[in-house]
């Protein structure tokens, strides 16, 4: 290896393809992003945000990624037109909308990051779907909203029952007091 070039052996390529294939198998969703022009410290910051969203970003060679897609036809179809240029795959192992939100928020601050395409549950995600997905609340937030609604409805019911009981109790007491006077 003269001149500092980095040659990848066939075994290295096969190992990389196997690794990407395994990551797709574990992921609930994935995104292709173009990170050309992003500074190293920005990439580090993005990786931290993605880790917080139970996701990871892997810089891949397009040819190796395409070979890894062969085991995942839905992903191959979804990413068919995205594998040009400087790409990374973002694997989402948790809530896919949290990953989409992390990417969308980062892309607002660092405009050179392009979210090219995504896939979730075997369905392709275009730009509009990814932006919509990023606006959805996560499972924990939805659970909190549901719990708040249930508790609110329960306390409203309790207040109604108490008011009804007081009214009935107050009306009966007034009726019994008036009866002896008349």
From Swiss-Prot:
This is Large ribosomal subunit protein uL10. GO terms for molecular function: large ribosomal subunit rRNA binding. GO terms for cellular component: ribonucleoprotein complex; ribosome. The keyword Coiled coil does not apply. Belongs to the universal ribosomal protein uL10 family. InterPro entries: Ribosomal_uL10, Ribosomal_uL10-like_sf, Ribosomal_uL10_bac, Ribosomal_uL10_bac_type. SUPFAM superfamilies: Ribosomal protein L10-like. HAMAP family: Ribosomal_uL10. The keyword Metal-binding does not apply.
